[in-house]
């Protein structure tokens, strides 16, 4: 492992020199590519330097403990050595995690699709709650979150479905574990006898695809326009800015009506379509390589019940890892860090176990 770490550091230093070369700086494409690679290695190199520093300090402290004649100084050296011996395994574990193979899609932006499931109007209200939860979480992370398409439910404040585009640092890698069925248990406002109802909404998180990731033939597309905010067929009037695109071979349908111009809505709809097709492509590749792990945390199985939000008990339970918190109001306000951090740590532990085996 440490030979690999040293070679990574050597590569990091080489790229650092290249980035200061005026010829490289003049070639913007090459500069961006090198800078991205440099940024990707920085965390590993810093962790490796921390480990080396601690290891050197431990060696020096143990040597001092042996050679020191003053009992008081020997005791101080022994205490420092004990502290460093406890710290080194933690630093090594962190290095192992950083060396785990990266999912190329983790650094991408993401598209979140939320759909009301079983439970009627209450499911639609819960879908809207989930949308606000993710919007607030994105805001906490300093990400950009834009609505691509929304279909309102039959009661005020409810949603049939909504698509969000989230842009920022490592968005997909952080949000990918949110895919699945989210269940809510609470007393609806219309419930006169105080009975708890159970409803559900599904969440799908897709990595945003680039044009080079998937090939889409124009002949395979059917585009319809309609008036934003309402139903309509093609060419109803001159203010049809909303766009619906059907990918005929796959049957995938995407729509966008949030932008003011038809061109902008078409671009956003195509972005959604590319991401859906890219997601299918990646899933097929993983299955063909037998790399799709059975763990629900790993696969993001969208048919699996992953989490329950119990309002009477102020409890949120993630069933994949048995994680429970009684801070439901904070979670619904976007404070998802404890849950997401626990899921990511579990995934890292599972991957470390697989690497060891």
Curated annotation (Swiss-Prot):
Principal location class:
cytoplasm
GO cellular component, as recorded: cytoplasm
The reply to whether Cytoplasm figures as a keyword in the UniProt entry is yes
Instruction: Spell out the post-translational modification annotation for this entry.
Output: Methylated by PrmC. Methylation increases the termination efficiency of RF1.
A GO MF annotation of the entry reads: translation release factor activity, codon specific
UniProt keyword terms in alphabetical order: Cytoplasm, Methylation, Protein biosynthesis
Which PROSITE patterns does the annotation name? RF_PROK_I
Signal peptide (residue range): none
Do you know which Pfam families this protein is assigned to?
PCRF, RF-1
N5-methylglutamine: modified positions? 234
Q: Which Gene3D superfamilies match?
A: 3.30.160.20, 3.30.70.1660, 6.10.140.1950
Which compartment or compartments is the protein found in? Cytoplasm
Q: What does this protein do?
A: Peptide chain release factor 1 directs the termination of translation in response to the peptide chain termination codons UAG and UAA.
* Matching HAMAP family: Rel_fac_1 (MF_00093)
Family stated for the protein in its record: Belongs to the prokaryotic/mitochondrial release factor family.
Name this protein carries in UniProt: Peptide chain release factor 1
| Phylogenetic lineage | Bacteria, Pseudomonadati, Chlorobiota, Chlorobiia, Chlorobiales
Name the gene for this chain.
Answer: prfA
């Amino acid at each position: 492992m440490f030979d690999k770490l040293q070679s990574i550091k050597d590569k990091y230093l080489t790229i650092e020199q290249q980035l200061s070369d005026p010829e490289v700086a003049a070639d913007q494409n090459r500069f961006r590519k090198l800078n991205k690679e440099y940024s990707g290695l920085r965390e590993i190199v810093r962790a490796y330097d921390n480990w080396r520093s601690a290891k050197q300090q431990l060696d020096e402290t143990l040597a001092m403990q042996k050679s020191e004649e003053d009992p008081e100084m020997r005791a101080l050296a022994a205490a420092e050595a004990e502290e460093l011996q406890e710290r080194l395994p933690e630093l090594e574990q962190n290095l192992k995690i950083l060396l785990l193979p990266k999912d190329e899609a983790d650094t991408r932006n993401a598209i979140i699709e939320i759909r009301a499931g079983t439970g009627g109007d209450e499911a639609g209200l819960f879908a809207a709650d989930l949308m606000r939860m993710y919007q607030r979480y994105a805001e906490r992370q300093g990400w950009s979150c834009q609505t691509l398409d929304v279909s309102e439910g039959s009661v005020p404040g409810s949603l049939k479905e909504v698509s969000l585009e989230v842009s920022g640092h490592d968005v997909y890698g952080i949000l990918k574990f949110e895919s699945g069925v989210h269940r809510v248990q609470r007393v609806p406002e219309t419930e006169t006898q105080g009975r708890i109802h159970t409803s559900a909404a599904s969440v799908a998180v897709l990595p945003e695809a680039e044009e080079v990731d998937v090939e889409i033939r124009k002949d395979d597309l059917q585009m319809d326009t309609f008036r934003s905010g309402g139903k309509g067929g093609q060419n109803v009037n001159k203010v049809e800015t909303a766009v619906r695109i059907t990918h005929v071979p796959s049957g995938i349908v995407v729509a966008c009506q949030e932008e003011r111009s038809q061109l902008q809505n078409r671009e956003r709809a195509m972005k959604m379509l590319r991401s859906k097709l890219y997601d299918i492509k990646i899933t097929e590749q993983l299955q063909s390589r037998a790399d799709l792990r059975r763990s629900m945390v790993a696969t993001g199985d969208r048919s699996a019940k992953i989490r329950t939000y119990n309002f009477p008990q102020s409890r949120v339970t993630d069933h994949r890892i048995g994680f429970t918190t009684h801070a439901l109001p904070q979670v619904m306000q976007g404070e998802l860090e404890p849950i997401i951090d626990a899921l990511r740590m579990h995934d890292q532990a599972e991957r470390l176990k697989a690497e060891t085996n």
